[in-house]
């Protein structure tokens, strides 16, 4: 006996005119927005910047983000970074995150959730700067709307220059 149950657990009827219906996923148009930023980071300081589409985009939902960061620093130094989602804007980075480990402080745990994290360590000959970079592709699940905020937060052990580029995949 042939079963009429499909993979989703729903029973489908078959009619003589039309066979079993094919499940389909609705495709929503996606726009790609590239944003380029550069900044100077100070030693032993927690800093961050918001990841959002530039321009006159009023209503959107971010589904994916591709983050590329290039750092120029002396050998033997460390940069920690995390990518967080927040329900409200973050004004004071030092009040929200601990200094070397970038953990969320207890007073902000109900509004900030960590999505991804990582670190960059430099190696090379003493006396010369080396350039390091990292790429991070972040899938945001159901997405982040324009009322929520997405940040990249960094802690560095030495003053350095950062070039941050992100490509945001948004649904309008």
Swiss-Prot record:
A Pfam family per the record: Nanovirus_coat
Signal peptide: none
Stated name of the protein: Capsid protein
Recorded name of the encoding gene: DNA-S
Lineage: superkingdom: Viruses
Primary location class: virion
Disulphide bonds in the chain: none
Ranges of biased composition (kind: Basic residues): 9-20
Cytoplasm keyword on record: no
Keyword NAD assigned: no
GO cellular component, one term: T=1 icosahedral viral capsid
Keywords, sorted A to Z: Capsid protein, T=1 icosahedral capsid protein, Virion
Phylogenetic classification of the source organism: Viruses, Monodnaviria, Shotokuvirae, Cressdnaviricota, Arfiviricetes
Record localization: Virion
Region (Disordered): 1-23
């Amino acid at each position: 006996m042939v079963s009429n149950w499909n993979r989703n657990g729903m029973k489908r009827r078959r009619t003589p005119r039309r066979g079993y219906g094919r499940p389909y996923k609705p495709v929503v148009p996606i726009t790609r927005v590239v944003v380029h930023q550069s900044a100077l980071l100070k030693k032993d300081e927690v800093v961050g910047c918001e990841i959002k589409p530039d321009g006159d985009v009023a209503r959107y939902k971010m589904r994916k983000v591709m983050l590329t960061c290039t750092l120029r620093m002396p050998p033997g130094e460390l940069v920690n970074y995390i990518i967080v989602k927040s329900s409200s804007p973050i004004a004071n980075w030092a009040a929200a995150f601990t200094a070397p480990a970038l953990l969320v402080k207890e007073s902000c745990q109900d509004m900030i959730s960590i999505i991804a994290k990582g670190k960059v360590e430099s190696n090379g000959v003493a006396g010369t700067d080396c350039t390091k970079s990292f790429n991070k592709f972040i899938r945001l699940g159901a997405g982040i709307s324009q009322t929520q905020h997405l940040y990249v937060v960094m802690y560095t052990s030495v003053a350095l220059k950062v070039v941050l580029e992100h490509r945001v995949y948004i649904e309008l």
